[in-house]
């Protein structure tokens, strides 16, 4: 693991000591090299001892999320260049440093062997993310968004810390490989139910569960492009990863406790999709669509079957790349018309035909057509939910229908129609932007050819 963590940390001195006109090029190329050299980790043989140490370990659950995190760093740097073009060199280097610190804490979260280390790194990601939102956001409301993000996350996480301390005192270890052998069968008591709730609530806030999601649209809308990308692609997946780890350990309790959360997720999935139909703000629409997709992941994790675990991990990876691509496209529109309102960006297809092609591809992937990994993830989750109850066909079918509707609404509103007068003299699409979209689309394409490497522990 150190061969990934140490080069990433060394990006910080590279950013500060490189010449001013080469700061973006050097950091992007170096981080892209780290991404490419880390891809070999996706090959997980049956013997995991090569990826094991007292502090860090990788298995087929954490590796795909870790690779997604590493892959996203150069993409964030490519996307941020225009946003910081008018800033001073010190601002640019500070921004890059903040992103790298966030990256290191995310890598250590996904690779943590100990639950306390996982908790510490999980909380550490909060600080750089909040700095990115409150320091480099576009509007004044970014301070309000930062406050929401901070307090929702902290209020969900503090009970988890107390519970972890309690488990440490009782069992003597929080090592993820030791815990399955130390935990005794848990009775369905009021106290153990509370223990399950405190363990999962921190991750449900992060997912977010419908009802605890109010911080997400605010944070997405006010964050700069790198903040939106890392929020959508990685930070929401931290919740899913934590829930997968914890619910497997507290196994018998999950089958007693899952019912209200399943109902809330099924309801929230349809509601957040419906909210998307009424949005005028591009980034807000994509943020609410993330809530809808993550509700599917919560349903999959709660059902606790091998198929649902495969579906949850596949959908998390697929959604990470898709939503990040959509945020990049929304940002490219914002950089040209300086407004997030969709109706003001209408008719851009005639002015930016290549960008319209990327919009079409991203919209299609968001609707989960075959042969994309989005479809594989959704199919696995939907079939598992049918095996739990046949009545889930109604909310699931409705969600698929509404997802298609709001995606087409977003596509047609921004690309079709008569071009507005203020959009006549906009800049053309740059090679940098097309490269960025291609680097989002290429992994989705390649993974659809061989999805088994991201199907997780139960494949």
Swiss-Prot record:
The entry's keywords? Electron transport, Membrane, Mitochondrion, Mitochondrion inner membrane, NAD, Respiratory chain, Translocase, Transmembrane, Transmembrane helix, Transport, Ubiquinone
Write down any Gene Ontology CC term.
mitochondrial inner membrane
The way it spans or sits in the membrane comes to: Multi-pass membrane protein
What's the catalysed reaction? a ubiquinone + NADH + 5 H(+)(in) = a ubiquinol + NAD(+) + 4 H(+)(out)
Task: Name the principal localization, coarsely classed.
Answer: mitochondrion
- GO biological process annotations for this chain's record? electron transport coupled proton transport; mitochondrial electron transport, NADH to ubiquinone; mitochondrial respiratory chain complex I assembly
Entry's EC annotation: 7.1.1.2
Molecular function (GO) terms listed?
Answer: NADH dehydrogenase (ubiquinone) activity; ubiquinone binding
Question: Where, subcellularly, is it found?
Answer: Mitochondrion inner membrane
Residues spanning the membrane: 21-43, 60-80, 99-119, 147-167, 195-215, 224-244, 257-277, 284-303, 308-330, 351-371, 375-395, 436-456
Its assembly, as annotated, is: Core subunit of respiratory chain NADH dehydrogenase (Complex I) which is composed of 45 different subunits.
Q: What biological function has been recorded for the protein in this entry?
A: Core subunit of the mitochondrial membrane respiratory chain NADH dehydrogenase (Complex I) which catalyzes electron transfer from NADH through the respiratory chain, using ubiquinone as an electron acceptor. Essential for the catalytic activity and assembly of complex I.
Q: Which family does it belong to?
A: Belongs to the complex I subunit 4 family.
Q: List the protein's name.
A: NADH-ubiquinone oxidoreductase chain 4
Give the gene that encodes this protein: MT-ND4
